[in-house]
Amino acid sequence: MNEVMVIKEGWLQKRGEYIKTWRPRYFLLKSDGSFIGYKEKPDSTEHSLLPPLNNFSVAECQLMKTERPRPNTFVIRCLQWTTVIERTFHVDTPEEREEWIIAIQTVANGLKNQVPEDEEEEAMEVKYGSPSDVSSAEQMDVAMSKGRPKVTMNDFDYLKLLGKGTFGKVILVREKATGLYYAMKILRKEVIIAKDEVAHTLTESRVLQNTKHPFLTGLKYAFQTSDRLCFVMEYANGGELFFHLSRERVFTEDRARFYGAEIVSALEYLHSRNVVYRDIKLENLMLDKDGHVKITDFGLCKEGITDGATMRTFCGTPEYLAPEVLEDNDYGRAVDWWGLGVVMYEMMCGRLPFYNQDHERLFELILMEETRFPRTLSPEAKSLLAGLLKKDPKQRLGGGPDDAQEVMSHGFFASINWQDVTERKLSPPFKPQVTSEIDTRYFDDEFTAQSITLTPPDRYDNLDALESEQRPHFPQFSYSSSIRE
């Protein structure tokens, strides 16, 4: 095994991702492609001991020189875990910039043919350029029985539009063979590729396939056509918590406790499987027909996070971003407990803990402002929210090695039997008044009133004959599993 060497080191000015200020960072570029930044210059013995503020890989990177927003700026476009990121740096002279660019490019070129065989399968390697340039190393371990008939668009009746987003739409469908109802998420490949969301989408598919928990949305099938990816998921027709809270303005503490407990149970399960959710927000929390929580939309999940492991990709809704994300630092599982704090604050207080239409001001509030609580809150609720919304992730409730157990043992949840939570034995405080599987009263009629337009079915007739090499971005995407076991 080759010894990892420091190829180049020195001070760089790095631009913040959200708060666009320049911060001095001492960076080390190593022969294994790691590009790590520290607040202070570490001495040689500290390299492996000090936790870095920034940790990137220059493998498969692209480099760009620019004189904006400052002279002698360069941008690195690279893969951070499974997401394509861009980071902006600035130095004092053109010569210094050239030295860094040559060093980074040399390391990146040297790594091109050195991917170990055992890592090749796991690396979801996103390359840049035209679709044909994308490596088929973007693979997913899909346990799929070979004898099972393949699923196509023709296997479903398309009933109602449930939602629309940047990448596609969600439609209420009925499986023709069984008469069962599902939510089908249809994503347009060209948009996913254009917006560098390939890795996020593959992550969503893999997380959905490998998780089974009462409060996580189950995946029934995943398949693709020539231009679309389709997830056929459990259909939760109780509506988004956002929908209900926006109509009721505030929930009682008991009701918030119930939803909070089910979210904690789901996060404990994900964290135990080394998955950090990262995008807890009301819009991603659905209710099923009985009133239990279903967490949806796994596109922002980051896989492979263990205690103490951190990640450096930017995603999430601005109002829900944790301070450590804004401060441009590595972050770990504690971001989910911050997210829980924000949604529980919304439920019990009827507003976001920090809000401003101006994002720069919003980020300032998240970083600096003390959390304020209405006088109507109980001491236990106040204590829980204050703990979850601690700025320092190490001090945050749930931020220690015990993770979810810290949250579960808080006084606010003293009345909760956690075994009963997981077994769905607690009575939901609100039961959606749905009269049938196709009752969409809790979905926005902005969508449900629209007619569904799909490409004519004959476009899909022979798509399952496509070989994986004709699908360079999404090989082995298909999946089939019984939700109702």
Curated annotation (Swiss-Prot):
Q: EC number(s)?
A: 2.7.11.1
Reaction equation(s) it catalyzes: L-seryl-[protein] + ATP = O-phospho-L-seryl-[protein] + ADP + H(+); L-threonyl-[protein] + ATP = O-phospho-L-threonyl-[protein] + ADP + H(+)
- SMART domains noted in UniProt: PH (SM00233), S_TK_X (SM00133), S_TKc (SM00220)
This protein's record includes keyword Ion transport = no
User: SUPFAM superfamilies, per this entry?
Assistant: PH domain-like (SSF50729), Protein kinase-like (PK-like) (SSF56112)
Please state every residue range assigned to the domain named AGC-kinase C-terminal: 414-485
Give a GO cellular-component term: plasma membrane
**InterPro entries from the entry?**
AGC-kinase_C, Akt2, Kinase-like_dom_sf, PH-like_dom_sf, PH_domain, PH_PKB, Pkinase_C, Prot_kinase_dom
Residues given in the record as ATP binding sites: 162-170, 185
Q: Which GO terms describe its biological process?
A: positive regulation of protein targeting to membrane; response to peptide hormone
Q: Pfam families from the xrefs?
A: PH, Pkinase, Pkinase_C
Describe the location of the Protein kinase domain by residue ranges: 156-413
- Domain of life where this protein originates: Eukaryota
The protein's recorded glycosylation sites are 132, 135, 310, 317, 478
Query: Where does the PH domain lie?
Result: 5-109
Gene3D superfamilies, per this entry?
Phosphorylase Kinase, domain 1, Pleckstrin-homology domain (PH domain)/Phosphotyrosine-binding domain (PTB), Transferase(Phosphotransferase) domain 1
Phosphothreonine PTM sites in chain numbering: 313
Q: How is its activity regulated?
A: Two specific sites, one in the kinase domain (Thr-313) and the other in the C-terminal regulatory region (Ser-478), need to be phosphorylated for its full activation.
What does this gene product do?
Akt2-b is one of several closely related serine/threonine-protein kinases known as the AKT kinase, and which regulate many processes including metabolism, proliferation, cell survival, growth and angiogenesis. This is mediated through serine and/or threonine phosphorylation of a range of downstream substrates. Over 100 substrate candidates have been reported so far, but for most of them, no isoform specificity has been reported. May be involved in the inhibition of ciliogenesis.
What family classification does the UniProt entry report for this protein?
Belongs to the protein kinase superfamily. AGC Ser/Thr protein kinase family. RAC subfamily.
Please state what the protein is called. RAC-beta serine/threonine-protein kinase B
Instruction: Tell me which species this is from.
Output: Xenopus laevis
Gene of this entry: akt2-b
